[in-house]
């Protein structure tokens, strides 16, 4: 099969960060007194969204007068600290797949809700940024 172009997502596809987001979301939810079963539903609703769409989704599920942006900032701070200490893992086979696609002259894109600085940092850390022809980030799309 000949591929002309392939577009990837970042979290949970290129990098193994989705599980880290979930871990830190649940931790922060517990700290705020949100039951785990409610947080699991909230996490499912906000996965892959932007901070703007996620505010409404989070507040619809959680309610309780909890400020989503403060919650998000605490989660992102925990995520950043973890990645600073331990790095971020690629999902298995990612580098080989990207190399294969480029060898076949396929265009490769990334479309992610992750912000530019974080996403490009992940790509550069694993030296896979060179495989991407087009990049779209959560903070570069107008709402």
Question: How would you label these PLM feature ranges?
Answer:
Residues 3-95, 100, 104, 117:
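N-terminal helical cap/lid subdomain that shapes the substrate entry/recognition surface
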Residues 14, 109-110:
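Short catalytic-loop micro-motif centered on adjacent basic/acidic residues
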Residues 88-89, 109, 115-143:
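Substrate-recognition "cap/lid" segment bordering the active-site pocket of phosphatases
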């Amino acid at each position: 099969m000949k591929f002309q172009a392939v577009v990837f997502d970042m979290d949970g596809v290129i990098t193994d960060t989705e599980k880290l987001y979930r871990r830190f979301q649940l931790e922060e939810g517990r700290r705020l007194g949100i039951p785990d079963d409610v947080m699991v539903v909230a996490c499912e609703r906000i996965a892959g969204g932007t901070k703007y769409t996620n505010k409404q989704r989070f507040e619809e599920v959680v309610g309780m007068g909890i400020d989503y942006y403060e919650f998000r900032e605490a989660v992102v701070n925990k995520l950043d600290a973890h990645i600073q200490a331990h790095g971020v893992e690629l999902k298995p086979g990612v580098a080989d797949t990207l190399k294969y696609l480029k060898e076949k002259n396929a265009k490769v894109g990334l479309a992610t809700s992750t912000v530019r600085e974080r996403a490009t940092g992940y790509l550069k850390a694993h030296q896979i940024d060179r495989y991407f022809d087009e990049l779209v980030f959560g903070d570069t799309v107008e709402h």
